[in-house]
């Protein structure tokens, strides 16, 4: 039995709890309630797996069916996991598409889940329902409450239309989740030695029962319950025990199929598995029916199914030979209140393996997988050296561990990303994030957890490293630590445990490890284009734009594939459109942006502006003679008309501005707010209007200076994804509007494409992007010279050593000025570290000094300030990380 579970009052519980001498022994009358709750958790896990496989409606139907059954029982027992599961599903949909109506629905559901969770905490405490081997009653619903609160706050924080006040409200909500998660996380860390001791006892009991050919029913989900039949007793013949054992087996089979990645398969194909069997495939399994009803025609023994690879949450640090130290006189389990002391990392570091290429990659949904460096082994093969610890961990304990680790990891990373413009709010809120700690938590969860938390952790990592917004600045690399110089890669796709030392290695070169996990998840969920989208992003981050676009295009072109979740389709189409823009395939890019008007309500104004900008650039390519067309004049007219049509239509859909924006919502609950890119396009088009007034004889298109498509490409991280050919085309296209005979202009005394004299403001925009292009072409000296002479010198008035930094506050293009100084920091780093005798500490300090200047120039709330601030902060954090490594 469990001893001393409540010798001390738990710091985790929000309410006072009774203590019971002699440990936790659930009242038999509560067994059904406990198993009902565990079954609810497994049902919720399965419903959320349906979403991950793009079968959202199946998941919703499952939750609704279970909720109806729950209501019919007229039980007073709450079921808070159901609204949370639905809220998580709606949260994922909302953050994929950022559609106001979807965000509002998720907001309402998560608010309901918050309230339901607190009711469930009270209920479990009141009736002393001990669902965990370690934690006090109600702990799991403190986690569901924290998860609901966190996701709700993120919905508020992730809206680009937020100002300082809205962000502050979200941060205060985050603090509520932070406090709960911090308390439980500390408890988990304190309890790990006890957890491992109990795990060893469970494994020993399992082994003994297998050797004695006893019943194969796992009681791990019912703390305090003893299967007397396994000890020679006869209570298993009692009807109530028969029912309990059947329910325990049902929960076990649900957990097993989920961990193996087969829970969404045809249930008729499910096999009974003896959790106590050895790993040999020749062993047999006794079904629960024969165990509890052997003399009434129960099912015969069935061959043991090959056990699939498990993702164990914790690994027993004690070698199997040491299990004997737990002799028969010490058969009782411990609880967390028995042991409160600090402990080191208990993980055993794994040897490193050479990375394998994806030569024989799976072809899922007829779309070829191009991810390089991923392990191509079948995920359905069991690693015989890997212990099945996960099957000895209760569903509730698994949820607590993975849930806290995911949510606390997300919190740490999100707080670390707060841009400088609203970072001051953090001092009011009273806490700050630790990016490295948060990333380690996310990596550990993604590697070791086979549930919604593990997959969400992976999704967060993929968005963080390979997403369209630059959260981490890969341009800053320590010499010799570039991915190309790493000769050995840890194999993580089948790991049940990961050490801190291994996580530190992973954090240095994450691009070598995300492909392994993504390949595994695509195998679990082959129907969801979301994972294919992530693979495309990964390829784009590697500079393989053609492969990335081909992967996405082949998927949507295949008549046998279907994307059920419209948000995923919209995200895939948007990303593909940007890839085409990076490749200068402007017809395809414009086609995709226009298609988005019909399937997504995120921002019609931005889609129209993007499409018009693509047609404008195609028009300029024909003008420059960069592409051949059959009928030049006809093509020019077509692309010119299309560009003018969409560019002029874009502002009519801007909230609070255009005639077509009356039904446009601006965030949760409406508000008619403009997003940053709404303000951006209005400003750009105002410049065109001003130019037309100054030059009334010029056409609309001829009044454009630097083409806006290059600015849009920059903010979606396109310059870091182009190859040499694409970069050279970019350099030429940027020169279209340049002054005659100016640096890197396409205009000279013999030919002049620009119809008005380039002003200083437009020239600064052009030169900024040309300097970045030159740097990407490894022409560092040319690029930094261009940036200094034609951009920074125009607004920085004093930058001498030992003198205060001074600048002119310019407003023509608000994002430009801090961005130029940020890019100057990157030039400093690359120029300094390219030398053999580089002084890395000096390079770090000089680069950081430019970032500090960037913060000073960019101080304030302006259009795109959040994106600019994130880039600056990402670079600063990266450089701070280097300080600890040299």
From Swiss-Prot:
Cellular component per GO, a single term: mitochondrial outer membrane
Pfam annotation, one family: Iml2-TPR_39
Bias kind Low complexity: ranges: 224-237, 287-297
Region (Disordered): 207-238, 287-335
Compositional bias per record (Polar residues), positions renumbered to this chain: 210-219, 304-313
Alphabetized InterPro entries for the sequence: Iml2/TPR_39, TPR-like_helical_dom_sf
Positions with biased composition (Acidic residues): 322-335
DNA damage is among the record's keywords: no
Region forming the signal peptide: none
Keywords: Cytoplasm, Nucleus, Phosphoprotein
Subcellular location: Cytoplasm; Nucleus
Family affiliation: Belongs to the IML2 family.
Function of the protein: Inclusion body (IB) resident protein that interacts strongly with lipid droplet (LD) proteins. Involved in LD-mediated IB clearing after protein folding stress, probably by enabling access to the IBs of an LD-stored soluble sterol derivative that acts as a chaperone in inclusion clearing.
Complex and partners: Interacts with lipid droplet proteins.
The protein's name: Inclusion body clearance protein IML2
